[in-house]
A protein has these predicted regions:
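Active-site-adjacent mobile loop/cap segments within catalytic or ligand-binding domains
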Residues: 48-113, 485-490
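A glycine-rich, often tryptophan-bearing local segment used as a flexible ligand/cofactor-contacting loop or short
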Residues: 339-443, 459, 500
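Active-site microenvironments of hydrolase-like enzyme catalytic domains
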Residues: 1-31, 55-78
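Pro/Thr/Ser/Gly-rich low-complexity, intrinsically disordered linker/stalk tracts
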Residues: 106-149, 183, 197-216
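Beta-strand-rich modules
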Residues: 178-199
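Aromatic-Pro/Gly-enriched surface loop or interdomain linker
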Residues: 205-331, 336, 502-516
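Catalytic beta-strand/loop cores that center a nucleophilic Ser/Cys/Thr
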Residues: 48, 406-494
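Short alpha-beta junction capping motif
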Residues: 215-224, 231-243, 324-392, 482-484, ...
Length: 517
């Protein structure tokens, strides 16, 4: 069974609710909600999404309630094509919002009142230093192409100091806010959009900190905005989700994952024995919460930057590209890429999203590095996405080799989560580091890491994976770049992150020469 089905019942109690209302209101509700769901799915990610129909049947849940009621069979968990969508956080949000809009339209039609849909979250968030010790927090509203009433009329800015909780927020009708800051403390900000329909989900989090007598200003750019389903493939006689290769990225947390898929054989699709049928999974995580993208990594990076003696601001990668946040004003840039990589949704008809280095970002970084900038980049797919990704081009590879001074040496670079510093460069501590490679409720899992090779004069290996000696980090003293094939924020502890960040910034901004393996 493929597609969406709606169920209602009109024949109970002579076709009337207890208050006398016609039970055909349940049919109206079902039709409106289903129409909204199917329309939104077809317009965004699957133009051939199937609308199965409306059933007037005496299901208990449709028959007993004394108010307009519907049952929604959105998709089938036994259908691989459906679950490629159903496992994706973007699809879950799209459908949930469509259900909300459908219910709102139904209530509006019953009472003959206009309705307003809550806005979408804002984007292009940035926190930069302003005059008089203040910080300017700015963003861009997002217009909903599926709903004209969802335009924001104002915003609420929430503030967190150091590792405390967020406050109750400050309202503004403009897409920016000046915030007072106490030197030496980290201020974090998230923004919601509001209108008569309600308040949007919160934006990602940006942060800033002024260090008295600091060594310089660093800009943290969050380029990790990916949320997606696990890697899925259908080839010849096999189909399924390959969570050991790429478990996807939940939106903050996931409670639906129960374990990795074990049976991929399409010949077992009709098997009635659950444990050996197509799609059979382990159950070792069925009571666990799985961590995902917290959208709060500028704070994690910034805390280590501040402890190294540098002031920092932060911005989303969209703010750098769309609104022109200037990199040239900063001594160094820390680009967060986490598990960012080009991925599709469902069968891929909507194209790719979440590329590590978009053409616009490449142009911005080229200009910054040509002007004597200093750049730190970390992520699981910094090379894979530019060499073998779905949107990879020769220009991408040239950018990596010419600007960032590394080349691709393979993915799945390590089976163990240990990295050691091997360079003789005096600026790096000869330490060993560990990154998170298991499921945790508050951290995302790193399934794969990239192996890199130095490219160009002055580039040298800094770190290697312990289990196979492949290169995990490349630096270039002449161009002041440092690139890691695993995410910085995935390191096990604050102590490890603080030590490594101090070494990296000392190398990038300390004027020391390169070293050899």
């Amino acid at each position: 069974t493929i597609g969406t089905l709606g169920i209602f019942y009109t024949r109970e109690n002579k076709g009337r609710f207890e208050g006398g209302a016609d039970r055909y209101r349940s049919r109206d509700l079902t039709d409106i909600v289903m129409t909204q769901i199917v329309s939104d799915i077809r317009r965004t990610c699957e133009p051939e999404w199937n609308r199965r129909g409306l059933w007037n049947r005496a299901y208990y849940e449709a028959r007993v309630p004394g108010a307009p009621t519907m049952l929604l069979e959105l998709l089938s968990h036994q259908n691989f094509a459906d679950m490629r969508y159903g496992s994706d956080p973007r699809f879950k949000f799209l459908v949930s919002r469509a259900i909300y809009k459908g219910i709102l339209q139904y209530i509006s039609s019953q009472y003959e009142l206009p309705y307003v849909v809550q806005p979408l979250p804002v984007e292009s968030l940035a926190a930069e230093f302003a005059a008089d010790g203040k910080v300017a927090v700015s963003w861009s509203p997002v217009m909903d192409s599926l709903e004209t009433t969802a335009a924001p009329t104002g915003y609420v800015v929430y503030t967190r100091i150091d590792d405390g909780g967020f406050d109750n927020g400050r309202y503004t009708d403009k897409p920016y806010l000046l915030s007072e800051q106490e030197p030496g403390r980290i201020y974090s900000y998230k923004v919601t959009a509001v209108n008569e329909g309600g308040e949007s989900f919160p934006s990602e989090v940006v942060a800033a900190c002024r260090i008295p007598g600091g060594k310089g200003n660093v800009l943290v750019v969050n380029g990790f905005d990916r949320i997606s389903a696990p890697l899925s493939m259908r080839r010849d006689s096999l189909a399924g989700f390959y969570t050991e290769l790429d478990g996807g990225v939940p939106d903050k947390q996931d409670i639906s994952f129960i374990g990795g898929q074990q049976v991929f054989d399409l010949a077992m699709a009709g098997c009635e024995v659950d444990s050996i049928a197509l799609g059979a999974c382990n159950c070792d995580y069925e009571t666990e919460v799985i961590g995902g993208n917290t959208f709060d990594y500028p704070y994690v990076h910034g805390r280590s930057i501040a402890r190294a003696g540098y002031s920092f601001c932060s911005a989303s990668v969209r703010a750098v590209g769309d609104r022109g946040v200037s990199l040239e004003e900063y001594s160094a840039v820390d680009l967060i890429l986490g598990k960012q990589r080009s991925v599709t949704i469902g069968r891929g008809v909507a194209g790719y999203a979440f590329k590590t280095f978009s053409p616009e970002l490449q142009d911005v970084l080229r200009r910054y590095m040509a002007g004597d900038g200093a750049l730190f980049v970390s992520g699981s797919y910094v090379a894979t996405d530019l060499w073998t990704g779905g949107e990879a081009t020769p220009a991408d590879r040239a950018f990596a080799e010419e600007v960032l001074h590394y080349t691709y040496d393979g993915d799945q670079a390590a089976d163990r989560n240990r990295v050691r510093v091997v360079t003789s460069h005096a600026g790096f501590s000869r330490d060993e580091y560990r990154y998170v490679d298991d499921f945790r409720p508050d951290r995302y899992r790193v399934e794969r890491v990239d192996a890199l090779r130095p490219a160009g004069g002055g580039a040298f290996p800094v770190m290697r994976y312990v289990d196979n000696n492949r290169c995990a980090g490349v630096a270039c003293a002449d161009s002041r770049t440092f690139v890691m094939g695993f995410p910085f924020e995935a390191l096990e502890s604050d102590v490890q992150r603080d030590r490594l960040m101090a070494d990296i910034l000392g190398f990038l901004l300390g004027g020391k020469s390169g070293g050899d393996d």
